[in-house]
């Protein structure tokens, strides 16, 4: 590529190219002037180290809990296990091999690791994204299309989908080990250094490749997740409205029948012939019906709160996906179509923090999908009994967590979810 050759030779006075992320293209600008702020490298190292430790710790705990606890091997958790593995790969094979060359202004790991890290980085990003899409579709099918989804919502089907996801990702990213190579250059102090570069034979191929990645790893997955979680939120919102109408109807019926008798138009009163079993139990227990009513009311309120929490969590998932990945995909597309302008504006500190933002997804995924779920926390306590137990929650919190757990696993049918508050509390 003539344009790249001229940039590497710095013939026009333009700094050598910066690598912008997804493909591990060295991720730094060589021979750049030192940062204007002396504290910037220290802050960069601190933030990278923090994200690295959180990601390794969080995903390792998720993998350990899901593997050692057989009771947690549900369909959704199988996808979460695959997601944790891909996020751990993203952290281990990307962050060190991006941060260290950035600081040293030299890719010191050799040609083999240049090819390997670019390949594993692309694969881990692809697997992570496709896993997020699979989780959203699995939840959508279980909540919004329960009858149709029963056929394929099995562990064996989930394992097949995960295997296909990994194989597809490895196949898609095969250009990286083929076209990633070390490119030597001479610094201003006459020292020789190397850049790990992913360079396709032509500018058109480079543009087509980054456009392809933008579509299959960002735009299309983002749209699918927005639609799936939007439909789930709509389903839950309709359930909330149904609960509210049922509660209102129950209050009206209670007000109209509070005296235990009915009045017709002639002014006569008709006493009920047979009291219900619930009334008999209330009389025998000396007002125990009030406690049953309070439990029912508490469970209904907890169910409502749980549904609202799930809706908020789904919104957070979509927002974080776009927040973490939009900057880096936009930067890669910008560089593919306008290399000079992108490298001038994004070199050095800006691209380093854009990359850091994309790596943040590998540490927030375990928090959103696992540690916010009470069943996973209980599984964690069972796997690591040395950890302190926070103690049993109250009845209202327990009912809400139970409902939220069922919703997060997407195991309820549309009818049962929408009519939860109309049914009696489980015995």
Swiss-Prot record:
Record's function text: Receptor for cholecystokinin. Mediates pancreatic growth and enzyme secretion, smooth muscle contraction of the gall bladder and stomach. Has a 1000-fold higher affinity for CCK rather than for gastrin. It modulates feeding and dopamine-induced behavior in the central and peripheral nervous system. This receptor mediates its action by association with G proteins that activate a phosphatidylinositol-calcium second messenger system.
Spans traversing the lipid bilayer: 42-67, 78-104, 116-137, 158-178, 211-234, 313-333, 349-372
SMART domains the UniProt entry points to: 7TM_GPCR_Srsx
GO molecular function: cholecystokinin receptor activity; neuropeptide receptor activity
Annotated source species: Oryctolagus cuniculus
GO CC entries: plasma membrane
Protein name, entry field: Cholecystokinin receptor type A
Bias type Polar residues, positions: 411-421
Intrachain S-S bonds: 18-29, 114-196
Superkingdom: Eukaryota
Region (Disordered): 391-427
Extracellular side: 1-41, 105-115, 179-210, 334-348
Main location: membrane
Homology family: Belongs to the G-protein coupled receptor 1 family.
Subcellular location as annotated: Cell membrane
InterPro entries registered for this protein in UniProt: Cholcskin_rcpt, Cholcy_rcpt_A, CholecystokininA_recpt_N, CholecystokininA_recpt_N_sf, GPCR_Rhodpsn, GPCR_Rhodpsn_7TM
One Pfam family it belongs to: CholecysA-Rec_N
Topology within the bilayer: Multi-pass membrane protein
Keyword Ligase: no
Cytoplasmic side: 68-77, 138-157, 235-312, 373-427
Glycosylation sites: 10, 24, 190
Lipid-attached positions, S-palmitoyl cysteine: 386
PROSITE patterns named among the record's database cross-references: G_PROTEIN_RECEP_F1_1, G_PROTEIN_RECEP_F1_2
Signal peptide annotation: none
Keywords recorded for this protein, A-Z: Cell membrane, Disulfide bond, G-protein coupled receptor, Glycoprotein, Lipoprotein, Membrane, Palmitate, Receptor, Transducer, Transmembrane, Transmembrane helix
């Amino acid at each position: 590529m003539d344009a790249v050759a001229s940039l590497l030779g710095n013939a026009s006075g333009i700094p050598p190219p910066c690598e912008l992320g997804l493909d591990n293209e060295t991720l730094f600008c060589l021979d750049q002037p030192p940062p204007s702020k002396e504290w910037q490298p220290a802050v960069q190292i601190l933030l990278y180290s923090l994200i690295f430790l959180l990601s390794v710790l969080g995903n390792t705990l998720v993998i350990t809990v899901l593997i050692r606890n057989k009771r947690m091997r549900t369909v959704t958790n199988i996808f979460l296990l695959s997601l944790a593995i891909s996020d751990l790969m993203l952290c281990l094979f990307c962050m060190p091999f991006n941060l260290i060359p950035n600081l040293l202004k030299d890719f010191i790991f050799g040609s083999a690791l240049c090819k390997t890290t670019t390949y594993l980085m692309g694969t881990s990003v692809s697997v992570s994204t496709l896993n997020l899409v699979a989780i959203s579709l699995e939840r959508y099918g279980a909540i919004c299309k329960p009858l149709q989804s029963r056929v394929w919502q099995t562990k064996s089907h989930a394992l097949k989908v995960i295997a296909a996801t990994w194989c597809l990702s490895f196949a898609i990213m095969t250009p990286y080990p083929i076209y990633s190579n070390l490119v030597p250059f001479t610094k201003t102090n006459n020292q020789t250094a190397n850049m790990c570069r992913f360079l396709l034979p032509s500018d058109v191929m480079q543009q087509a490749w980054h456009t392809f990645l933008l579509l299959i790893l960002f735009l299309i997955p983002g749209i699918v997740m927005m639609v799936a979680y939007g439909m789930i939120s709509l389903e839950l919102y309709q359930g909330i409205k149904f609960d509210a109408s049922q509660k209102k109807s129950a209050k009206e019926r209670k007000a109209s029948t509070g005296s235990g008798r009915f009045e017709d138009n002639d002014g006569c009163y008709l006493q009920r012939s047979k009291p219900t079993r619930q009334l008999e139990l209330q009389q025998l227990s000396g007002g125990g019906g009030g406690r049953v009513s309070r439990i029912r009311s508490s469970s209904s309120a907890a169910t409502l709160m749980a549904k609202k929490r799930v809706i908020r969590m789904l919104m957070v998932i979509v927002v974080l996906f776009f927040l973490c990945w939009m900057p880096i995909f936009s930067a890669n597309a910008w560089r593919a179509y306008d290399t000079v302008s992108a490298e001038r504006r994004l070199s050095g500190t800006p691209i380093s923090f854009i990359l850091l933002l994309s790596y943040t997804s590998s540490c927030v995924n375990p928090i959103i999908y696992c540690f916010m779920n009470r069943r996973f926390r209980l599984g964690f306590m069972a796997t690591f009994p040395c950890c302190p137990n926070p103690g049993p929650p109250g009845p209202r919190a327990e009912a809400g967590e139970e409902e939220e757990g069922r919703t997060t696993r997407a195991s309820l049918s549309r009818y049962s979810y929408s009519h939860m508050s109309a049914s009696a509390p489980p015995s």
